[in-house]
Amino acid sequence: MLVAGAIIVKAVTETNTHGARAIGYAVPGPGGKAMPQLVVVPAHAARRPPLLVFLHGKGQDQSSSATSAFYAALAAAGPEAPDVVFPYGGEDSYWHNRETGDWGRYVMDGVIPAAIKRLHADSHRVAIAGLSMGGFGAYDLARLHPGRFCGVGADSAALWRQGGETATGAFDNGEDFERHNVIEAAQSSTNPYPGARLWLDVGTEDPFRPADTSLADALRTKGVAVSFHVWPGGHDESYWNSHWAAVLRFFTKALAACR
């Protein structure tokens, strides 16, 4: 809890929140360890707000994406903007159940219910997104829980088309990769994301661009609509901060349309 408190002080004192409230707390994670969370409530929050779950990238933490650009974009999204929860997911969990812990279960059974209860959020209007490692996690978790989310999205999703291409530590072994191969799932399933509006963006110089494009192509081949964007830039904070406004506009509309 002290860690969460430190996070909220940093978020509020060093960043212009545009009237939003940043709140830190902890929920039990894999192995019962307390995992810090950062939730952000817009200045004009609804009584039963929608919820956006945003998963961080490798080597980041729950406060990494709560930048000035994020807060400005949240304010610009207007009165229907969602509350946002940024959970901590470890250094390189890749947000799935594996030998190091049940990271996927932690999100679904810990992070989301705790945020809904604390924020009095609408349990039916929930979206999930993330960047890099978190972008993979968002598409993987939504695939494994079809119908749970109104929107699914990723910035610069850390995806690979073959197990031999993956980053060290991303998966336990080849079988683990195959169980969580979202591109193959999109190619073999009619629609792994029923009822969800899909977002995916990637930079022109991002090494994940080919794999992200493969995911978008696989979805479109199946007749699944996906808002896919390739914008100038690489796999870095400058790129991600440049597109917060577009991302939050998309999810605000997706959640408003979900009833």
Name every feature range the model reports, one short phrase each:
Residues V3-R259:
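Non-catalytic cap/lid and distal C-terminal segments of serine-dependent acyl enzymes
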